């Protein structure tokens, strides 16, 4: 009887446990899903679920899963780079505890709202950024048949890349007409592109290492310190996103006279857990010398370039991320007399350089406080070593003996280090209902340049140190009104006092299609040698060199800009425009004062002038029909003048206008993609008339003068056809085209060894035929 009673109690207990535990066992469910686009899985899509604020990434098959979800209503948001985000509401209940759903992503008709970082040092949508940020993707660089960064930046509004030496072809970037030393080049957001590296660096960075390039015009010293007066160009290298590879070969024939071979490849591996990945790029280039005027001296130098690098990420734990990249650029460059049978220092005129450049950077980011706060620690380093020769073989027998006993070979070494911390915090309901993202940071930048040619008594030994502290407030006053303000304080070893660089910018969004912006910013340039100052040119039958005035002080700037951005989407069509007015005032502006001759050639001294003004208008127009026809263009009208006339050549009347700066320039790009197999690109670059100094010395140039050179229209096109190899899961693409169809190239060059090597302008190369093949993983 007692045992029966115990058994009855046990059965009752088990029954009660089953009854009360039923809702507990079944009060949780799961959501699984599949993300695709045009029948293809989209891996590494970010899947967010609200209100629990949990994020996962889709796997290599496009699938994701949320486990152990309490019954309730959830909002799922899917976002992926290159696709329009989508949102859906899903209910998990006792009736349907396990939900399986499919999401189809679509590519936007036109990329108008990329996520950018350069304008504020925080990630924001372009339409939400107080500062206009233009984006040039790695894919667009390849469609434009750009071999390097220098060729791609021509297709950005307000930007010009010019070749400034007939012998070595060094380049500089002009933003709103300001010379290269006024622009800050960043690699993954870090200012390690040193002045000496900048001489040839834009040509040494291959396009296949690049994820995208972000461009901010106007003063940026409040975030990036010295030299960001004209603007900032941020080169972002490829990060691994999925397992993939691509191999590309291109052959170029320059005006039926010289060959150019380019081979590059990319290989990417990502772990199954998607917590680590590595991307490798390789590039090789061999270009022959090119002589345009048949004087046996080159207009395009020989190039022998090899580069490689890796970019990687690792997620050691939740909300922690480590990014690391390292690359090596190795280049041999020779221009001058086209003789191969004698050593370099026996040739009539020659510039020979061998560069070995290492660049590395590392970022560690921690997100905390429910993702309202983040801390970023970063370190970046660059080292360039260079062997070089710059010389003219003399005519006089006594000078020949001196030349041969001590030929003008030289050595250069540059090291740049950057270390810093950045803290971001998002304040909710800050004073008004809006949010405010506060950014505070500090960084240290060290740059050491040694450049010497003993034969010329030329010795540059420059070390700069800069400690910067910056504070920024990104305040959403109202849903359609945003105020961005901030200030940076720099302590520079070449400047006696602290440099304060404030900025403020107002963004007003008129509905969803229009953004109005008004910005003010200040900047400075330290009294140091920049890229063009470190270039020894040929002029007047000798060489020319630049020295710094002992009284040189920092240059200051104030910049204003106002813009209207409008984009109107329709069912299958979108069109838009951007109109911007800009004005920059320079105080104590740098200029080169002719300073006579010595036994080696011309001398110039860098001095401070009284002031200068840069102002103008930039207009952009864009449209896209159903992702099959896309048009983009930009045109700039500007006026750049010194306050007082500047003497560029001794004995030639001074002028106020900036040299080598046209008042009108622009570009246009038309891309046709009628189907997934065929593609066509037609692009155009216009360069207006400008003033270029021309020194005497060559046999065909007997007077010093400033020349108002002709305008140029550079038209190019590219055709491509792709074929899918389904068994191998590969795509093979053939492409061909012509650069500079109209052969719009400088038609008058100096002749012989005593030429003025800086008298070069217009398009970088004459008509060039190209063709190639690309093999990559994936599906059409």
Q: Where are the model-predicted features located?
A:
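Short, acidic, small-residue-rich periplasmic hinge/interaction motif at the N-terminus
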Residues: 36-38, 44-50, 79-83, 97-142, ...
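Extracytoplasmic beta-strand/coil segments of soluble accessory domains associated
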Residues: 133, 150-191, 211
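Short acidic/polar hinge/loop motifs at secondary-structure boundaries
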Residues: 172-174, 190-217, 238, 265
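Outer-membrane beta-barrel translocator/receptor signature
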Residues: 194-196, 209-211, 222-293, 301-308, ...
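Membrane-embedded beta-barrel scaffold of Gram-negative outer-membrane proteins
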Residues: 265, 374-390, 509, 517, ...
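Flexible loop and strand-edge segments within Gram-negative outer membrane beta-barrel domains
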Residues: 287-307, 313-375, 382-415
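Gram-negative outer-membrane beta-barrel transporters
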Residues: 478, 576-577, 582-585, 605-696
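C-terminal beta-signal and adjacent terminal beta-strands/loops
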Residues: 587, 631, 677, 686-696, ...
């Amino acid at each position: 009887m007692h045992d029966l009673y115990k058994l009855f109690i046990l059965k009752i207990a088990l029954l009660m446990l089953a009854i009360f535990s039923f809702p507990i066992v079944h009060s949780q469910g799961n959501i699984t899903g599949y993300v695709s686009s045009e029948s293809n899985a989209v891996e590494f899509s970010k899947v967010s679920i609200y209100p629990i604020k949990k994020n996962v990434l889709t796997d290599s098959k496009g699938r994701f899963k949320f486990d152990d979800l309490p019954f309730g209503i959830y909002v799922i948001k899917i976002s992926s780079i290159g696709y329009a985000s989508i949102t859906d509401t899903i209910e998990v209940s006792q009736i349907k505890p396990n939900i399986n759903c499919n999401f189809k992503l679509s590519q936007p008709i036109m990329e108008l709202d990329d996520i950018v970082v350069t304008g504020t040092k925080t990630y924001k949508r372009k339409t939400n950024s107080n500062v206009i940020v233009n984006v040039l993707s790695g894919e667009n660089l390849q469609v434009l048949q750009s071999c390097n960064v220098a060729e791609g930046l021509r297709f950005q509004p307000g930007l010009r890349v010019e070749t400034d030496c007939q012998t070595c072809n060094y380049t500089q970037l002009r933003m709103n007409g300001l010379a290269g030393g006024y622009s800050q080049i960043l690699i993954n957001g870090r200012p390690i592109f040193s002045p000496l590296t900048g001489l040839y660096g834009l040509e040494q960075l291959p396009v296949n290492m690049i994820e995208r390039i972000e461009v901010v015009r106007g003063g940026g010293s409040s975030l990036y310190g010295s030299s960001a007066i004209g603007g900032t160009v941020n080169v972002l290298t490829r990060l691994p996103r999925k397992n993939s590879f691509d191999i590309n070969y291109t052959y170029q024939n320059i005006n039926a006279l010289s060959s150019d071979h380019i081979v590059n490849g990319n290989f990417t591996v990502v772990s199954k857990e998607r917590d680590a990945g590595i991307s490798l790029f390789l590039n090789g280039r061999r270009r022959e010398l090119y002589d345009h005027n048949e004087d046996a001296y080159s207009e395009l130098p020989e190039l022998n370039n090899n580069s490689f690098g890796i970019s990687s990420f690792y997620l050691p734990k939740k909300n922690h991320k480590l990014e690391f990249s390292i690359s090596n650029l190795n280049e041999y460059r020779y221009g001058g007399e086209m003789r191969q049978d004698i050593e370099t220092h026996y040739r009539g005129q020659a510039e020979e350089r061998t560069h070995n450049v290492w660049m590395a950077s590392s970022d560690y980011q921690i997100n905390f406080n429910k993702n309202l706060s983040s801390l970023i620690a970063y370190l970046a380093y660059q080292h360039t070593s260079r062997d070089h020769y710059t010389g003219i073989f003399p005519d006089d027998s006594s000078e020949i003996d001196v030349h041969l006993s001590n030929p003008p070979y030289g050595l250069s070494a540059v090291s740049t280090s950057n270390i810093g911390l950045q803290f971001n915090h998002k304040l909710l309901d800050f004073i008004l209902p809006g949010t405010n993202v506060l950014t505070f940071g500090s960084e240290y930048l060290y740059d050491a340049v040694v450049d010497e040619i003993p034969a010329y008594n030329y010795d540059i030994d420059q070390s700069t140190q800069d400690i910067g502290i910056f504070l920024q407030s990104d305040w959403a006053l109202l849903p359609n009104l945003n105020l961005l303000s901030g200030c940076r304080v720099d302590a520079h070893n070449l400047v006696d006092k602290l440099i304060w660089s404030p900025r403020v910018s107002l963004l007003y969004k008129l509905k969803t299609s229009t953004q109005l912006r008004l910005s003010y910013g200040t900047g400075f340039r330290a009294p140091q040698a920049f890229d063009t100052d470190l270039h020894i040119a040929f002029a007047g039958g000798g060489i020319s060199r630049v020295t710094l005035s002992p009284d040189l002080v920092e240059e200051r700037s104030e910049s204003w800009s106002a813009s209207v951005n409008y984009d109107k989407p329709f069912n299958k069509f979108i069109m838009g425009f951007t109109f911007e007015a800009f004005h920059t005032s320079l105080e104590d502006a740098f200029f080169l004062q002719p300073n006579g001759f010595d036994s080696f050639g011309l001398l110039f001294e860098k001095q401070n002038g009284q002031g200068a003004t840069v102002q103008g208008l930039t207009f952009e127009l864009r449209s896209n029909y159903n992702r099959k026809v896309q048009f983009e263009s930009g045109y700039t009208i500007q006026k750049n003048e010194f306050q007082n006339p500047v003497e560029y050549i001794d004995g030639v009347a001074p002028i106020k206008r900036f040299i080598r700066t046209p008042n009108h320039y622009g570009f246009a790009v038309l891309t046709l993609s009628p189907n997934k197999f065929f593609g066509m690109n037609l692009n155009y670059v216009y360069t207006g008339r400008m003033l270029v100094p021309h020194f005497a010395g060559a046999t065909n140039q007997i007077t010093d003068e400033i020349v108002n050179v002709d305008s140029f229209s550079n038209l190019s096109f590219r055709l491509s056809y792709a074929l899918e190899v389904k068994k191998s899961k590969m795509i093979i693409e053939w492409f061909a085209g012509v650069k500079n169809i109209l052969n719009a190239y400088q038609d008058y060059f100096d002749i012989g060894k005593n030429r003025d090597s800086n008298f070069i302008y217009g398009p970088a190369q004459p008509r060039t035929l190209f063709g190639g093949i690309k093999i990559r993983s994936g599906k059409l």
